[in-house]
């Protein structure tokens, strides 16, 4: 009946489609552990089970073999159940992370740690996998790689890092299948891994091979070559196995291979800037790279390989695939995505037409939305039937009575909680996935063995369609009976003329003769889990219509077995929907934090709490990955509280922004809503269901006492407490539940904050209806309400720590202030925290609070004792009196809102109130800003904005009038004279302002029992007067400062006083120096009542202007100096002017300011000629310019040890080169080598051939990118040349360098290297530069190369003097250009010669002329070639001629026409 499955010749079967290779390898290794070994039939059954199990992949996220085994029916054929049991045992034995190494034996016992304290968070490691085993008795055979094999392996490991468990499993499987040689393994490594990983693997493999060769390997012959060569021989199976094991071990030794590197998966987004992507890579490498691993090569490799395609093209085009990171960043700096702005066009949906649909004939919808199928456009081209499409034509379907199924097309029904409707056939209460069938002529139908599930709540009944061929097909409900040999059908299904035969049937009740008949007509039975009917050649007919049985003859054709799935408890689905966003949508690896031990008392309490949570349905047993520790905490009443330490999960969670601005202000409840009720929810968070995919992040383990056995694993089914997004998620869910209630009762108010709810209504009837609707909605959504804690008027209503009365609000607990001078720091801090909580109802100004806040400052030890001064004790008394009057009014909707702003030296106090009310609505306090100086206009504008924001947010209104304590005169002066940004804000709100002045009794007698100090602030009184124009009769004061000195100049027709002085030792700030210089200048000008002050410091200029308008002084390091300014400026008239420094303008202001700056300048070079030479080794002429005589300079050069050693002649031979006609005309470039301390430097040198100015940079390479970088740096120093001349080295003739020269419009030519005629100048410059470097390193061996090169360039360009022009190279390079000599103008020469000439560029052999030369120069002469133009002609195209005879006289016989080349 069944197919015989021999042992497969293939050593390792292929995995089923959809299952990863490393998972399939675990199943194979578990099968190879069985005794006896598995057969092909076992592998066939395993593959068929896994194929259908992949349609319900809940056991794979993560993989859970126990869950997969529970899905397997009892008595399933083959050894599939045994294979799964091996996997379950192995999974429980392998720890989730390796145990730490045992500590060395200590000399003393470590201190006992508290087992109840949660351990610190430990990073979870990667899960382990099963090792690889060979199949029983099947040796692997060598087979070379093919491209499809390499592609398949690369596809499997594309999502795993080299060295990870998944990577190693796949590679091991490939090694077992193909038995590769050393060359095959090298090809696989180059195909799979990057060059960086391949090089690291190569290093590890070399070290492992060396150790193995030293240790000795069986079969290894040292004389036959290295191990790699011998392993390439397919006959050397033992050596090949040893090499394969070493090759696999090298992966495990890679740095960072213990887990998948997170930085390896960082990819650049399509629109992400390249520098942002590189910054993310750099941060990830800093956090994840093991210590000691070089970061730079990995960063450069990933910066190219993980970049998007556009940036990779840019890097390839510029040759920066593995260049320094700066070059890669510059190459992609200007890259922007092409389609960065996308426009989404949304068209409104048009209403449906009134015409009927042409498909169904009904109006009200478009034809595209019609439920009827689209009719065919015409008759079918195959059968000419107009009722169906060509794809549905019966002629296209082969008329095969029974297609042979595929071996893997097993009809298997695994029980699922929610079957997908598209993948299931329904019938008779059974559920089964569809069978995918293909015709295989070589397959036997007997290999099909479907598993037919039965409904446990009913008998094994199934609905079947029976076609007896004598009547129409009919559907019946039949009993599946494996004990019946034949199928039994009722006689009602057959027609009266159906031929029936008598037969005897032996059943459970005995033998019967007349109850059943036998029909020989074929009967077709269609079962719901089969696509093709069952054909029975004969069956029994029940003449009494009592039985319909599907017997073994029908089931044998199905090749199926019956099984009864285990009864499962139906899940309880809460009415509240699971949140769509939890903060873990990117699904990182769940944390694996070990459970720490608990003492017996705590363990017993934990087990009791877990049992209660399990009964309540909040948790469920769990077997997946992930773990967070748990522990109980005893409360004050003796009960225990369950605590789940979710710190690791919270660190992986993205914060969800809450839409709630905070707790509502209860004073916003109108007095018209007098009827109130509170609702308290029990266990609010435990009503939000948690999606299944997030359970690994909220799993925990309850350990057994003394570790007598494995702990019990649980996971939360609902949102747990301790999760940082739980309050936000619950608040959003509760808001969605209450929103329909708010819309149904617009006249009422529902206040919600977290799980606290307050109902407010104008009448008791409305309150009762609102309460009933709210209660019903909460209960219907599964939120239980605590009836015991419900409060309702008339009665005291306590909500959010406050007591709500009909017309006012008070706090539930007002702190008591003890009056004493000695306080412990925690006591005073706790008292101020409680006062801050009730500050919105405490009638006090900012001053008492600020005084006590200052008492907390300056302490570093929490155990300090604080001693209050008398003013601070007085502040305690003021706060005690204010707290006794703590009360706030409720909002009266018929009255406008009023505001009062009081600016004081300690901060701002803002009050919101309503007229004719006994108490204000709220008191708001704000400290002074942290800036050292804050104009009062800025404070007033900030207070107005804060007041409007608070009233709009809490009351939905703006203050109609705003009172303040600034005088009208001060206010108007600030508006007219200040340029502060707060001026437009004050002008915008000026129509609401009202000045109180000294009117202390109008608004405050009811709020404060004593009059409030609302007089104008003395600090806002202007100290001095600003003059808008300069004062002609007053002197001028200039001051300035640096980090080390300060200076001032007092001038009136001449300098009256000037002084520069150093700063005191602790002060090293330029601002302090500028302020100190101004103070000294004001002190010297104290006798003048008027003064003109000129400052180049913007800080000091704005500070004085703000001080003139009135300001509040904040904290500043210059506070002692700033306190002296009002005394020196009191009652003066000042004109302020800001000067821009270093303008070099000829006006007297700039000159006097420059003179003040000069007082701060310390001479840069205060060296004697000998000291200068010892530092720079400059030449003799440079020393004479620094004050030395010629003899002294010569003696200094002779006495210098470094100069005698490296350059005895004290000069370099001159080179010969065609020089430029002006600066930046022609440059010469070269790369010279300089070796120092075993480091070879490449000096890229550029020389201007006109001035000799040099630019040099030290590099480590001679690539084109380095040459381009050095040229750009030279251009930044010397300017852009017109021509550059280099040798024909690879760096200079590369395409990149030539393209760069073309883009900069620079003409590039080459010369012969080391030729004194063509490259003499740059070679001489190289010698001068290296000679100076040798001198510097002789004197100072530890001098850095960069510093030595900078000193050498300074010496060559700025100090050494050229003998032919007595200028330095820098002076000559920046000297003004000479006027050009025009060639079109006739020039008169004192000495004239006549020449025959040939024009350059022409091949004519005829001499022209003679012509008289207009001008002669070295190498050429200016010859008039026509009547209007002249041209310079070189000597090689000239020959001298005698002066021609005058026309009127005979020729002198002595004169000869001697001609020669010039």
Curated annotation (Swiss-Prot):
Record key words, sorted: Aspartyl protease, Capsid protein, DNA integration, DNA recombination, DNA-binding, Endonuclease, Eukaryotic host gene expression shutoff by virus, Eukaryotic host translation shutoff by virus, Host gene expression shutoff by virus, Host-virus interaction, Hydrolase, Lipoprotein, Magnesium, Metal-binding, Multifunctional enzyme, Myristate, Nuclease, Nucleotidyltransferase, Phosphoprotein, Protease, Repeat, RNA-directed DNA polymerase, Transferase, Viral genome integration, Viral nucleoprotein, Virion, Virus entry into host cell, Zinc, Zinc-finger
Binding residues for Mg(2+) 1: 680, 755-756
Region listing for Disordered, in residue ranges: 93-143
Site positions per UniProt: Cleavage: 130-131, 344-345, 449-450, 574-575, 582-583, 1021-1022, 1167-1168
Entry annotated with the keyword Transcription: no
Zinc fingers typed CCHC-type, residue spans: 355-372, 378-395
DNA-binding region per UniProt: 1393-1443
Domain Peptidase A2: 476-554
GO CC annotations, alphabetized: viral nucleocapsid
Domain Integrase catalytic: 1219-1388
Lipidation (N-myristoyl glycine): 2
Molecular functions (GO terms): aspartic-type endopeptidase activity; DNA binding; DNA-directed DNA polymerase activity; RNA stem-loop binding; RNA-directed DNA polymerase activity; RNA-DNA hybrid ribonuclease activity; structural molecule activity; zinc ion binding
The record's note on its domains: Gag polyprotein: Late-budding domains (L domains) are short sequence motifs essential for viral particle release. They can occur individually or in close proximity within structural proteins. They interacts with sorting cellular proteins of the multivesicular body (MVB) pathway. Most of these proteins are class E vacuolar protein sorting factors belonging to ESCRT-I, ESCRT-II or ESCRT-III complexes. Matrix protein p19 contains two L domains: a PTAP/PSAP motif which interacts with the UEV domain of TSG101, and a PPXY motif which binds to the WW domains of the ubiquitin ligase NEDD4.
Protein name in the entry: Gag-Pro-Pol polyprotein
Source species: Human T-cell leukemia virus 1 (isolate Melanesia mel5 subtype C) (HTLV-1)
């Amino acid at each position: 009946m069944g197919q015989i499955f021999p042992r497969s010749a293939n050593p390792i079967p292929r995995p089923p489609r959809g299952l990863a290779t490393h998972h399939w390898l675990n199943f194979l290794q578990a099968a190879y552990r069985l005794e006896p070994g598995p057969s092909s039939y076992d592998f066939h059954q395993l593959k068929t089970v896994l194929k259908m199990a992949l349609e319900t992949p809940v056991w794979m996220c993560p993989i859970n073999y126990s869950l997969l085994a529970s899905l397997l029916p009892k008595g399933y054929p083959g050894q599939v159940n045994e294979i799964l049991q091996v996997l379950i045992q192995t999974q429980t034995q392998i720890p989730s992370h390796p145990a730490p190494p045992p500590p060395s034996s200590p000399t003393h016992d470590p201190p006992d740690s508290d087992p109840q304290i949660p351990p610190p968070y430990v990073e979870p490691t990667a899960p382990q996998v099963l090792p690889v085993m060979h199949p029983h008795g099947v040796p692997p055979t060598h087979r070379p790689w093919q491209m499809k094999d390499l592609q398949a392996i690369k596809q499997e490991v594309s999502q795993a890092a080299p060295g990870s468990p998944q990577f190693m499993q796949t590679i091991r499987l490939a090694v077992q299948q193909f038995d590769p040689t050393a060359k095959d393994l090298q090809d696989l490594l180059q195909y799979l891994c990057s060059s960086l990983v391949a090089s690291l693997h190569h290093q590890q493999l070399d070290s492992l091979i060396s150790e193995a060769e030293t240790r000795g390997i069986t079969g290894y012959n040292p004389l036959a070559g290295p191990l790699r060569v011998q392993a390439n021989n397919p006959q050397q199976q033992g050596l090949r196995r040893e090499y394969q094991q070493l090759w696999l071990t090298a992966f495990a030794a890679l740095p960072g291979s213990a887990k998948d590197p997170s930085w390896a998966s960082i990819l650049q987004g399509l629109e992400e800037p390249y520098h942002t992507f590189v910054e993310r890579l750099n941060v990830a490498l800093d956090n994840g790279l093991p210590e000691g691993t070089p970061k730079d090569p990995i960063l450069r490799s990933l910066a190219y390989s993980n970049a998007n395609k556009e940036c990779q093209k840019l890097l390839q085009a510029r040759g920066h695939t593995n260049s320094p990171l700066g070059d890669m960043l510059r190459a992609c700096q200007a890259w922007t995505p092409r389609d960065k702005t996308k426009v989404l066009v949304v068209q409104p949906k048009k209403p449906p037409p009134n015409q009927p649909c042409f498909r169904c004939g009904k109006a009200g919808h478009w034809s595209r939305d019609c439920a009827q199928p689209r009719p065919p456009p015409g008759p079918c081209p195959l059968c000419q039937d107009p009722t169906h499409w060509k794809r549905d034509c019966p002629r296209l379907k082969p008329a095969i009575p029974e297609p042979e199924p595929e071996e893997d097309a097993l009809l298997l029904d695994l029980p699922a909680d929610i079957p997908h409707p598209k993948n299931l056939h329904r019938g008779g209460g059974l559920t089964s996935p569809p069978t995918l069938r293909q015709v295989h002529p070589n397959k036997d139908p007997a290999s099909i063995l479907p598993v037919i599930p039965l409904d446990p709540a009913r008998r094994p009944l199934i609905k079947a369609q029976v076609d007896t061929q004598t009547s129409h097909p009919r559907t019946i409900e039949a009993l599946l009976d494996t004990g019946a040999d034949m199928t039994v059908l009722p006689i009602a299904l057959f027609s009266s003329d159906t031929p029936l035969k008598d037969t005897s049937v032996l059943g459970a009740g005995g033998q019967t003769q007349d109850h059943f008949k036998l029909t020989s007509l074929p009967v077709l039975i269609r079962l719901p889990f089969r696509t093709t009917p069952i054909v029975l050649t004969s069956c029994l007919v029940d003449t009494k219509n009592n039985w319909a049985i599907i017997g073994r003859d029908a089931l044998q054709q199905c090749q199926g077995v019956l099984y009864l799935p285990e009864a499962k408890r139906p899940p309880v689905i809460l009415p509240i929907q699971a949140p769509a966003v939890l903060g873990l949508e990117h699904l990182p690896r769940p944390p694996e934090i070990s459970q720490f031990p608990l003492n017996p008392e705590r363990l017993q309490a934990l087990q009791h709490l877990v049992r209660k949570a399990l009964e309540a349905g909040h948790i469920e047993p769990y077997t997946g990955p992930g773990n967070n520790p748990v522990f109980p905490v005893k409360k004050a009443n003796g009960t225990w509280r369950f605590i789940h330490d979710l710190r690791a999960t919270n660190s992986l969670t993205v914060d969800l922004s809450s839409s709630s601005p905070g707790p509502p202000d209860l004073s916003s409840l109108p007095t018209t809503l007098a009827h109130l009720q509170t609702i308290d929810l029990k266990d609010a968070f435990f009503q939000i269901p948690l999606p299944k995919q997030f359970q690994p992040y909220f799993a925990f383990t309850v350990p057994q006492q003394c570790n007598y056995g494995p702990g019990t694993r649980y996971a939360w089914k609902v949102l747990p407490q301790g999760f940082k997004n739980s309050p936000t998620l619950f608040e959003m869910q509760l808001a969605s539940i209450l929103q329909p209630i708010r819309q149904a009762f617009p006249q009422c108010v529902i206040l919600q904050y977290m799980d606290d709810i307050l109902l407010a209504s104008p009448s008791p009837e409305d309150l009762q209806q609102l309460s009933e609707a709210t209660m019903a909605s909460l209960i219907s959504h599964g939120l239980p309400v605590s009836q015991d804690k419900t409060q309702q008027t008339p009665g005291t209503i306590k909500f959010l720590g406050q007591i709500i009365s009909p017309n006012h609000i008070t706090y539930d607990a007002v702190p008591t202030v003890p009056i004493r001078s000695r306080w412990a720091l925690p006591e005073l801090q706790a008292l101020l925290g409680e006062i801050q909580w009730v500050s919105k109802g405490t009638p006090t100004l900012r001053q008492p609070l600020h005084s006590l806040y200052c008492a907390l400052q300056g302490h570093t030890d929490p155990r300090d004792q604080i001693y209050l001064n008398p003013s601070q004790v007085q502040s305690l008394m003021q706060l005690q009196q204010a707290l006794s009057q703590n009360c706030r009014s409720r909002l009266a909707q018929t009255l406008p809102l009023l505001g009062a702003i009081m600016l004081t030296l300690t901060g701002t106090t803002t009050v919101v109130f309503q007229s004719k009310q006994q108490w204000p609505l709220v008191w708001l306090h704000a400290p002074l800003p942290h800036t050292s100086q804050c104009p009062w206009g800025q404070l007033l504008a900030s207070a107005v904005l804060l007041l409007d924001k608070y009233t709009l947010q809490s009351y939905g209104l703006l203050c109609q009038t705003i009172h303040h304590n600034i005088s009208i005169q001060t206010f108007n002066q600030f508006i007219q004279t200040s340029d502060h940004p707060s001026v437009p804000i004050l002008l915008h709100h000026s129509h609401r302002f009202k000045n109180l002045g000294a009117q202390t009794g109008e608004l405050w007698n009811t709020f404060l029992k004593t009059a409030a100090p609302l007089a104008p602030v003395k600090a806002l009184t202007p100290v001095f007067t600003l003059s808008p124009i300069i004062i002609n009769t007053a002197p001028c004061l200039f001051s300035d400062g640096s980090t080390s000195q300060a200076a001032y100049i007092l001038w009136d027709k001449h300098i009256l006083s000037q002084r520069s002085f150093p700063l005191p030792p602790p002060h090293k700030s330029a601002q302090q120096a500028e302020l100190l210089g101004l103070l000294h200048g004001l002190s010297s000008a104290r006798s003048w009542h008027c003064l003109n002050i000129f400052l180049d410091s913007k800080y000091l200029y704005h500070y004085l202007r703000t001080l003139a308008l009135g300001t509040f002084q904040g904290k500043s390091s210059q506070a002692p100096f700033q306190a002296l300014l009002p005394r020196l400026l009191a009652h003066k008239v000042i004109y302020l002017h800001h000067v821009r420094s270093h303008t070099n303008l000829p006006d007297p202001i700039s000159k006097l300011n420059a003179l003040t700056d000069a007082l701060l300048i310390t001479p840069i070079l205060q060296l004697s000629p000998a000291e200068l030479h010892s530092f720079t080794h400059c030449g003799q002429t440079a020393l004479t310019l620094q004050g030395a005589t010629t003899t002294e300079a010569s003696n200094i050069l002779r006495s210098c040890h470094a100069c005698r050693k490296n350059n005895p002649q004290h000069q370099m031979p001159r080179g010969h080169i065609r020089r430029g006609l002006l600066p930046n005309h022609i440059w010469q470039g070269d790369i010279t080598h300089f070796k120092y301390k075993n480091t070879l430097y490449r000096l890229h040198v550029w020389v201007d051939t006109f001035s000799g100015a040099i630019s040099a940079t030290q590099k480590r390479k001679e690539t084109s990118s380095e040459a381009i970088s050095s040229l750009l740096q030279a251009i930044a120093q010397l300017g852009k040349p017109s021509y550059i001349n280099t040798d024909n080295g690879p760096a200079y003739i590369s395409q990149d360098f030539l393209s760069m020269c073309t883009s900069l419009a620079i003409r590039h030519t080459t010369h012969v290297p080391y030729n004194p005629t063509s490259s003499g100048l740059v070679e001489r410059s190289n010698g001068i530069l290296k000679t100076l470097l040798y001198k510097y390193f002789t004197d100072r061996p530890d001098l850095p190369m960069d510093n030595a090169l900078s000193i050498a360039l300074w010496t060559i360009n700025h100090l050494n003097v050229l003998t032919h022009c007595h200028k330095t190279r820098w002076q000559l390079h920046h000297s003004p250009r000479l006027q050009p000599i025009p060639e079109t103008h006739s020039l008169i020469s004192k000495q004239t010669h006549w020449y025959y000439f040939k024009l350059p560029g022409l091949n004519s052999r005829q001499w022209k002329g003679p012509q008289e030369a207009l001008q002669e120069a070295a190498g050429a002469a200016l010859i008039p070639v026509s009547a209007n133009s002249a041209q310079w002609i070189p000597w090689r195209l000239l020959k001298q001629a005698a002066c021609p005879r005058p026309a009127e006289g005979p020729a002198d016989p002595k004169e000869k026409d001697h001609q020669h080349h010039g």
